[in-house]
Amino acid sequence: VNPKVVEMTNRGIIHIVEPGLQELCSKVMEFGKLKASDVPEESDVYLIVVPTPFKGNHEPDISYVEAATRMVAPFLKKGDLFVIESTSPVGTTEKMANLLYALRPELEGKIYIAYCPERVLPGNVIYELMQNDRVIGGINSESTEKAIQFYRHFVRGTLHRTNARTAEM
């Protein structure tokens, strides 16, 4: 986590060029709906949106996904939704579910875990996040439905139900 980006965001300054993002950030900051932090805070929904670069052997590096999962694990509670949006190889959502259950065995079967790939083009991110169809797959049908309910609040495109492994393809 870059502390300078956190500080700038909390002042309402966006560090990247993305049409409409500065205005949106200013608006949500004005209403107290956005707070950047370098550590997770308690929530009902946790979105994992981190880079997944390739290693030297052309294999995806999911270490950022794992690190983010480990960061939020202490904050998860019964009924929470955990969604990975980072581009990830098939099986990543299940691996992170197993990691969460290893770290927090009391939450097995009590939290919702899903995958919803972020597929947007730079320069059109805000529009595409809201307008594009989304594929949403949970580790079970209850997780899929919980994620669908969440995305329905802001996605105008069609929400396609599936399982996590299919969504990761």
Mark where each language-model region is:
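Short, surface-exposed alpha-helical segments at coil->helix boundaries
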Residues: 3, 22, 93-94, 144-148
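Internal alpha-helical scaffold of NAD(P)-dependent oxidoreductase catalytic cores
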Residues: 98-116, 120, 125-169
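Conserved N-terminal Rossmann-fold NAD(P) cofactor-binding segment
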Residues: 2-45, 51-60, 102-105
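Rossmann-like NAD(P)(H) cofactor-binding subdomain of soluble oxidoreductases
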Residues: 54-119
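Alpha-helix C-terminal capping/helix-to-coil transition sites in glycosyltransferase folds
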Residues: 41-42, 78, 131
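Redox-cofactor binding/interface segments in oxidoreductases and associated redox assembly factors
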Residues: 46-48, 84, 137
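Short glycine-/small-residue-rich Rossmann-like dinucleotide-binding loops
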Residues: 50-52, 87, 140
